[in-house]
Amino acid sequence: MKTDIEIAQSVALKPIAEIVEQVGIGFDDIELYGKYKAKLSFDKIEAVRSQKVGKLILVTAINPTPAGEGKSTMSIGLADALNKIGKKTMIALREPSLGPVMGIKGGAAGGGYAQVLPMEDINLHFTGDMHAITTANNALSALLDNHIHQGNELDIDQRRVIWKRVVDLNDRALRQVIVGLGSSVNGIPREDGFDITVASEIMAILCLATDLSDLKKRLSNIVVAYSRDRKPIYVKDLKIEGALTLILKDAIKPNLVQTIYGTPALVHGGPFANIAHGCNSVLATSTALRLADYVVTEAGFGADLGAEKFLDIKTPNLPTSPDAIVIVATLRALKMHGGVSKEDLSQENVKAVKRGFTNLERHVNNMRQYGVPVVVAINQFTADTESEIATLKTLCSNIDVAVELASVWEDGADGGLELAQTVANVIETQSSNYKRLYNDEDTIEEKIKKIVTKIYGGNKVHFGPKAQIQLKEFSDNGWDKMPICMAKTQYSFSDNPNLLGAPTDFDITVREFVPKTGAGFIVALTGDVLTMPGLPKKPAALNMDVLEDGTAIGLF
């Protein structure tokens, strides 16, 4: 079997202008970035706002193994298969962050014969969105520090600056830094730090904004610091929201690419799901829904993180709610949740599948709480045995959830035909009665308690000393009616990454809150979740290179 990049490089791509014709996008509607990438114009986005909205399919997963469970691959393969059975379909996905590409993942554009292309471009600099977001974020930092240096008219307490710089890399050495060192001409010394770009609030804002004016409004509402009398300082106080919007005026336009099978794909925005809301842009998803009859999108990590945030944070900003939720499961992950070590996952173990099924079952029941029909997709691997597959299908049947085996990585669209037909049938025969998990009027404590007890299966929520102080502060500032974005490990329902399966007897501790008032949600930090990842001992970058003819190698 060829590697992902070998498969991608063997495909004869069609010009993107030709690909998008099938969904009614003309040459004058796009802004080309070479032959195979383009951005959708504002004029076209506005022109389709009044069109009929299609069906929305959300792809999520069980709690993943460190290698991931193939959500993006399954999303792409499902969309290709839906097109093959005659459903006019588009994909709306996140764009990768360069940090994880160089770190563990080595790439994030699907895999095998279910990829979005050109994968080298998408995984590296793409159309420059990440750089624009990084620049906007750091321009804000520079302008903020300059304000303090040039007299500090707003009386900003330099000890209470909460806005951090960002870089689109995994770089643990930058988590805590001191800026302004040297002579007085270098600014006022203060503690600072770097987050990874995809954790920036500006990334979240870009992904939730509905148009340029909404983008500007959200940017103006970012809290960057507090004054010496403890009042929040907003971007609008610095009067720089116009400049930040200018930097992002092209980045907000969704990117158009294609799959191996020629399915049009909108790949735009990329917040992490463990430290941010984990969904691609509202603008891309909303536009796709008006261009196609079916739209496949995904939310990061397991359903306890990405899907919960999609349904409670993103969906209220969309023109419709999901018509079906597809939960991706792998037998290797179920066996890991059933107590099997990573080294033994390739060995048949039906008992472990049964034990690990509790994780999938909880995710299915959780998604049903939102009133949306659920389908389970088994992402097939070569080590899966017939006994294990049959066992999993029986277990799914016992809880009355539709289940299909899919081999889209190996077989492309053909490997997802049965899944596509089942998903289409579910949408056509079952109605979605979407409802949020909590109400805006609920307090911050009430919202978090509902997430912890109803989604995670936990007992109680504890608030650390800093979080307790912030609860009153946020209420006084009028921030308590916003949705909650839980920052939690992706490997477990709990805040302990080693507590696998479907644990029940555990509590969650919130150590700190971060106001994302521009994006419109509050981040609750739990466990040891970091907003700037580090690199592994042997980063994927060690295997990357470029040949003399410019061909990339080592991306996967």
From Swiss-Prot:
The UniProt record lists the keyword Glycoprotein: no
UniProt entry tagged with the keyword Flavoprotein: no
Top enzyme category: ligase
Record GO biological process: tetrahydrofolate interconversion
Binding site for ATP: 65-72
GO molecular function, one term: ATP binding
Protein family: Belongs to the formate--tetrahydrofolate ligase family.
HAMAP family: FTHFS
Protein's name in the database: Formate--tetrahydrofolate ligase
Originating species: Streptococcus agalactiae serotype III (strain NEM316)
